[in-house]
Amino acid sequence: MEKTKNSKKFWIALVIFSLVGQVAWVVENMYFNVFIYKMWGASAGAISTMVAASAVAATVTTLLIGALSDKLGKRKIFICAGYILWGFSICSFALIRLDVINALFPAAASAAAVGVSLVIIMDCVMTFFGSSANDACFNAWLTEAADTANRGAVEGINAMMPLLAILVVFGGFMGFDLDKRESWTAIFLIIGITVVVLGIAGFFLIQESSIKAQGNAHYFKNIFYGFRPSVIRGNPVLYLTLIAYAAFGISIQIFMPYLILYFTVTLGMDNYVLIFAPAIVLAAVFTAFYGRVYDRLGFRKAVLPALILLLVGYVVLYFFRSTAPVFIGTLLMMCGYLAGMTVFGAMLRDFTPENKAGMFQGQRIVGQVLIPGIIGPAIGAAVLQNAETIIGDDGTTSFIPNENIFLAAFIAAIFIFVLLAPLFRKLRKR
């Protein structure tokens, strides 16, 4: 098989679009929870609702835009224009402030309730643009730009970006007091403008995919293409991988929406960035090389060590609260998380039917975002239902996350091994 020749522009586009896109997602997935918790006194249920609504928006968007980009045979315009609009939508969060809400809704009984509702609504709007650009079209473009000879290497770089994005965000957030509203205004403007600039740069960096538009002419049929029983039967490895990936994502989403709050509120680690940074750097380096394990040894020998690392990380985080063990547990958990994403992501790309990458991005999002985004945070919220509470300076009551989120994540992760069994059997028969 002839190896895909990737230009320098491809690697530059891969790194910066993946990194900046992940920075935006990190702020949404890890800090929007902090934003509505600190600024609006949101409950665990409200946080779970926000994550679930965003997951639904991401899935529907990816299904619609993925099929549309296949029909038109275009990726570049959706990526670039999508990033520009994505950036503007991020900037709009700078306007969700108490003074603005009081001016627009003077009769509202609770400005906090209005604030939480606006954040959830605008999160869905932002997710529409972000999923159009990143989930649907950037991922489809990436699938088409690589092949089985370098898939693991490309996916390794792509999969380590969430960790690097966390490092960038954590480092950047050190200069802000997250208890002050003006800090959040600056954060949303800085990130939003950066995403807009990148979208403009994409017109000069991204080379259009070679997908043929005339081969995918039936738009509405394409939207539901991946859900047809005949397609599922014809691609058993792909769908078994999606099911296992969904279980993996559920385990992650049980604790992830509450992770920063757990470290800052429960453990009182105001210097959590200094603890996270070394763990993130080491995990990012580990992930960059781990993609080659998939290339050389295959899925089975790559996914099992990743899951074991994840489970050990959960155990350490559940039993220990002091700085050193928390660092070790975080490192192991992050290594397992990102390595697992690398392996599952590469597997999905390798078994995506040729010239139908866009139509299958919706199915990827169902397994990677929708199912985990609805079930995971709901389990986390149920676990925290009777958690201790504190009363803030403004009189609002807030919950205190506890270590049981890691126990629940561990139990959920055990089911991944059960779901991998039929997948391994299918792979042995190939």
Where are these regions (language model features)?
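Multi-pass alpha-helical transporter architecture, strongest
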Residues: 93-100, 196-206, 402-430
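A membrane-interface helix-boundary motif in multi-pass transporters
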Residues: 75, 176-193, 384-412
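Glycine-rich segments within core transmembrane alpha-helices of 12-TM secondary carriers
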Residues: 58-59, 152-174, 365-377
